[in-house]
């Protein structure tokens, strides 16, 4: 499961969800329903798209970060016009992710 936080106008959420699910699932070779796009409410009137994509390794960021940002931006700005699109990343190692109290990564979780 990949989580993507969207900060931006409510009216853009359907388009953002569609593009982000399509592009992230293609890049990560997973099903689109494995990409959760969550809108976070902000107190900002700008018509911009801000996305925070959670990845599990620095390698994903290195290999996919720029290309994924370009594909998402192109999908949300097909003619090169439209809102500014910010794509940023957080790396959350699987050893620090828990589902129903069980570690999602390989090996034992540590907090070092």
Feature locations, PLM:
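Interaction-mediating elements
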Residues: 1-112
